[in-house]
Amino acid sequence: MITLKRLQWDNCFSYGEGNDLILDDNSVTQIIGTNGMGKSSIPLIIEEALYNKNSKGIKKADIPNRYINDGYKIVLTFTKDEDVYSVSINRKTSIKVKLERNGEDISSHTATNTYKTIQDIIGVDFKTFSQLVYQNTNASLQFLTATDTNRKKFLIDLL
């Protein structure tokens, strides 16, 4: 199991520079705010950091803050077992992805292969991760209205 520790980001969606969120202060975190305040952007940023895609299908060109338009940066720190991992993304015209384990660079030669390594470390696919990490009313309703077979399949996939 992984534990998300810290998320830092600059210029993603409606956010500017210098955002820092400690994710392991509590076992469950609820983000509350009015519409348009950036609540749903946080899990999307986490998905981008770990899987290079997001559950809303937002294109890469639409992720940078449109008022700054200077690319974006994401750093996500997480642990698995006794190891501390850090994923750093710097995207302007191209993407630079760096993966560290306990301070040592274990990135592959390409961003695609580095993301494959990240998924191997996490041990769950994108869909399962998104359903576990990001609960909104639609996602909760999907599980509740799913057939018994599909609910069972989802729960078995967690094991």
What is each PLM-predicted segment?
Residues 1-106:
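Extreme N-terminal "head/tail" segments of very large remodeling/mechanoenzyme assemblies
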Residues 26-29, 37, 82-159:
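Extended, charged alpha-helical "arm/stalk" segments used for dimerization and assembly
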